[in-house]
Amino acid sequence: MATTFNFELFKKRLNLFLEKIEDLGGATEPLTIEKPATEEEVKAVEAQLGYTLPPHFREGLLENTAHLEFWWDINDITDEDEDFLPEELAEIFCGELLFGLDLLLGYEESRKSWVEDVYPDYNNKYDRVWHNKMSFQQVGNGDYIAIELEPENYGKVVYLSHDGSENHGLYIADNFKEFLMNYAAVGCTGGEDWQWEPFYTKGKGIDPTSENALAWYKLLNINEKELDI
């Protein structure tokens, strides 16, 4: 799903969702976007990882931000009104995007621990998904969102499940920048897979033009033109 990266539009989408969630009575945290990383800072982390970061991720750190935090929660709304969410969106309760150069080594240490302790067999189809990835976001339930390092699908964004989800190994964007744009366009719902799954379209990944995405916008009083989809 070809998507043009526009950092200003990306930030606009994040702020719009925070505004709409607040209007409905949900909880939010201020959007945190730190200054870009330096080439020296990136190379220092790459030296410890033993490889060059995937290009879209690397460019994002150098050109846009070295650390970003975005979060909202609607549990208070759904506790008060159990029918607030339609059935197809009923699993949604929060949104989060949290990545940073400063977090990368810790995330990778944790992912590698899963590989060593639980999923060591590269010849096992499920285990193999955990291998040769670069995790950039740790999901609250223990899963990860990562970037593929295997040559065949290098650079794609992939979901890593620790507990047998059918979405384990699912590619949700062709690259990191596409992921940012499309994930922001649905409010970074998740990151647990069952929260963003309603917006997944086979062959497109997270799809802000999907029927469920349009229903989500309507629920939050968002005009899709505001998102410039």
Language-model features and meaning:
Residues 155-160:
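Short aromatic-glycine-(Arg/Gly/Cys) micro-motifs in beta-strand/loop hairpins
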Residues 161-187:
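Compact, glycine/acidic-enriched structural inserts
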Residues 131, 152-154:
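A short, compositionally biased
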Residues 1-139, 214-229:
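A surface-exposed partner-binding patch
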Residues 180-229:
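Long, compositionally biased interface segments
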Residues 143-150:
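Broad, structure-driven detector of short, well-ordered beta-strand segments within folded domains
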Residues 23, 27, 142, 189-193:
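Intrinsically disordered or highly flexible coil/loop and linker segments, enriched in small
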Residues 138, 149, 162:
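Active-site donor-binding loop signature of nucleotide-sugar glycosyltransferases
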